[in-house]
């Protein structure tokens, strides 16, 4: 059974992204776990983390709900946020509360559409919560329609058809908040 109470726990609060990629100076599961501790001490209500190693280390240090992702690049696709079942399977094993996936209308590796992959994902993990990382209004509506549990504005400005968007795109956040019934997580370009 899905734990929808998680959305009440994070509503109105700050979810802090604790991520550093391999070539970035803070790349280390140890450092990410300490960033998560600092976020929790500062009042964060949740953490967004990348990789099984970081999620596992963060889980040892904080008790905040987590949005988990795995950034994985495939040569035949621009989609890299939890793009395939391989990454979803690995994240489910961590016990992360919410798994975020790129929900843009771009094709995934192997030419799969979002509908193709998410149908497989939802059938395999009916009780797992999934967040749709969207770049535009139409994607958010579609993500809700196919069964995502929440939508985020994560990809606004990062797709060819949204590049140049001034971030944070508050009008986009407001528009989808009024249009969907699932929770909306305002994310991307928010530096306050």
Regions found by a protein language model. Name each.
Residues 1-26:
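N-terminal amphipathic alpha-helix/helix-capping segment at the start of soluble metabolic enzymes
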Residues 11-16, 62-76, 117, 122-132, ...:
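Short beta-strand/loop segments at the ligand-binding rim of alpha/beta enzyme cores
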Residues 15, 46-48, 67, 99-102, ...:
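Conserved beta-strand positions in the central sheet of alpha/beta enzyme cores
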Residues 18-21, 41, 70-74, 94-108, ...:
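Glycine-rich phosphate-binding active-site loops on the catalytic face of alpha/beta enzymes
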Residues 25-29, 48-67, 78-85, 103-121, ...:
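Active-site-adjacent beta->alpha loops and helix N-cap segments on the catalytic face
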Residues 35-48, 94-95:
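Catalytic domains of carbohydrate-active enzymes, especially glycoside hydrolases
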Residues 39, 58, 91, 143, ...:
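Conserved, mostly hydrophobic/aromatic
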Residues 43, 62-66, 94-98, 124-127, ...:
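Glycine-enriched alpha-helix->loop->beta-strand junction motifs that scaffold or abut catalytic
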């Amino acid at each position: 059974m899905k734990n929808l109470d998680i959305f009440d726990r994070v509503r109105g609060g700050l979810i802090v992204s604790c991520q550093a990629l391999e070539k970035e100076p803070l790349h280390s599961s140890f450092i990410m776990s300490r960033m998560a501790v600092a976020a929790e001490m500062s009042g964060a209500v949740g953490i967004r983390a990348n990789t099984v190693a970081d999620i596992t280390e963060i889980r040892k240090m904080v008790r905040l709900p987590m949005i988990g992702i795995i950034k994985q690049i495939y040569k035949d696709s621009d989609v890299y946020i939890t793009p395939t079942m391989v990454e979803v399977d690995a994240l489910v094993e961590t016990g992360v509360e919410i798994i975020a996936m790129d929900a843009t209308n771009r094709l995934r590796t192997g030419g799969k559409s979002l509908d193709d992959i998410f149908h497989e994902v939802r059938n395999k993990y009916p009780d797992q919560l999934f967040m749709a990382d969207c770049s535009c209004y139409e994607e958010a509506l579609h993500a809700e329609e196919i069964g995502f549990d929440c939508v985020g504005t994560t990809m606004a400005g990062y797709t060819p058809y949204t590049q140049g968007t001034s971030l944070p795109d508050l009008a986009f956040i407001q528009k989808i908040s009024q249009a969907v019934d699932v929770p909306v997580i305002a994310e991307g370009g928010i530096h306050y």
